[in-house]
């Protein structure tokens, strides 16, 4: 919306990707949606069945209308220089153990961003799940954030 009204990229100072972006994968997406469900076996099982049906219907509608999945759309938008300036430093924080977003997808997005001229830093954490890198190693996590933030103030 900002870009549409101003004709300029979003005036951000730094860009941190924590556990993403990824691409839609049926069961990974269902796991992500299920994360907020109650732990009760019966409720969780019933809700999961309903999620599978609803998600399948939504995917069919997107496909029938020729629309990109919103997750794919988001990933594409993040690498558009008319929306996000290339001189803004960005960090990708991710892990191989994430069962919601595959690490190769994060690395592919970072590589594409680098090809396009973005300033990219990729930080692979070991043994952490989706968006749980900070609790596992808060010193390293906040060090990355601080470093990216500080690098954003150099002369551009």
Please identify what each model-predicted range represents.
Residues 2-5, 112, 147-148:
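A generic secondary-structure signal
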Residues 1-50:
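Serine-dependent carboxylesterase/thioesterase catalytic core
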Residues 30-33, 73-77, 145:
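Generic structural signal of hydrophobic/aromatic residues within well-ordered alpha-helices
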Residues 2-8, 80-81, 116-117, 153-156:
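Alpha-helix termini
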Residues 135-156:
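Catalytic active-site module of serine/aspartate enzymes centered on a nucleophile-bearing elbow/loop
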Residues 48-140:
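Serine-hydrolase catalytic core
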Residues 42-43, 109, 151:
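N-terminal pre-domain and mature-chain start segments
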Residues 27, 102-104, 153:
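Short linear functional motifs in flexible/disordered or boundary regions
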């Amino acid at each position: 919306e900002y870009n549409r009204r101003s004709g300029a990229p979003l005036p951000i100072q730094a860009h941190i990707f924590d556990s993403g972006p990824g691409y839609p994968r049926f069961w990974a997406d269902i796991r992500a949606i299920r994360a907020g469900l109650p732990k009760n076996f019966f409720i969780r099982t019933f809700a999961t069945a309903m999620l599978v049906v609803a998600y399948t219907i939504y995917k069919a509608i997107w496909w029938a209308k020729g629309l990109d999945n919103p997750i794919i759309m988001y990933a594409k938008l993040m690498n558009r220089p008319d929306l996000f300036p290339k001189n803004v430093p960005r960090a990708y924080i991710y892990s191989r153990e994430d069962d919601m977003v595959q690490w190769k997808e994060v690395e592919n997005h970072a590589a594409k961003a680098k090809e396009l001229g973005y300033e990219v830093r990729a930080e692979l954490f070991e043994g952490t799940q989706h968006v749980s890198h900070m609790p596992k190693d808060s010193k390293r996590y906040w060090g990355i954030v601080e470093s990216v933030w500080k690098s954003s103030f150099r002369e551009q």
